[in-house]
Curated annotation (Swiss-Prot):
Modified sites of kind N6-acetyllysine: K87
Lineage: superkingdom: Eukaryota
Gene field: CRYAA
Residue numbers binding Zn(2+) 2: H95
Biological function: Contributes to the transparency and refractive index of the lens. In its oxidized form (absence of intramolecular disulfide bond), acts as a chaperone, preventing aggregation of various proteins under a wide range of stress conditions. Required for the correct formation of lens intermediate filaments as part of a complex composed of BFSP1, BFSP2 and CRYAA.
Phosphoserine: residues carrying this PTM: S110
Glycosylation sites: S150
Domain annotation sHSP: ranges: 40-150
Annotated S-S bridges: C119-C130
Keyword annotations from UniProtKB, A to Z: Acetylation, Chaperone, Cytoplasm, Disulfide bond, Eye lens protein, Glycoprotein, Metal-binding, Methylation, Nucleus, Phosphoprotein, Zinc
Binding, Zn(2+) 1: H88, E90
Organism: Galegeeska rufescens
Name the record gives this protein: Alpha-crystallin A chain
Subunit structure: Heteromer composed of three CRYAA and one CRYAB subunits. Inter-subunit bridging via zinc ions enhances stability, which is crucial as there is no protein turn over in the lens. Can also form homodimers and homotetramers (dimers of dimers) which serve as the building blocks of homooligomers. Within homooligomers, the zinc-binding motif is created from residues of 3 different molecules. His-88 and Glu-90 from one molecule are ligands of the zinc ion, and His-95 and His-142 residues from additional molecules complete the site with tetrahedral coordination geometry.
GO biological process, one term: response to heat
Amino acid sequence: ALGPFYPSRXXXXXXXXXXXXXXXXXXXXXXXXXXXXQSLFRTVLDSGISEVRSDRDQFLILLDVKHFSPEDLTVKVLDDFVEIHGKHNERQDDHGYISREFHRRYRLPSNVDQSALSCSLSADGMLTFCGXXVQSGMDASHSERAIPVSREEKPSSAPSS
């Protein structure tokens, strides 16, 4: 009487082992996908999150450049655009050696007074570019010019996203 049941019990045990192996493979794939998503998220954060604010009084760009010093950054205005470039040579970090470079370009609103632009870098690596908006009827000047980056000793007061 045990003969007919023995093979079916072995097949059920083999199927249960195969199902457990498939579940373990799916869990390993989900863990690998979560690690890849965290790595991608870290890369996005390190790429320089920016925020642009504009109202009737001022135009403001906030850019996370924590991996760069003021000497690594150039900010210039060309016609109606602000161009921000950051580059540092290869240096050692926790994982080996890395060099970074980025280019950002933003259109200035037509009412921004380009003769009164400022740019500063906070102690926590937040670059703040600011331009006052001119009142209607006044003419905003438009030409190419470099905007120096000054260093602030205090952290940025901008809310982090």
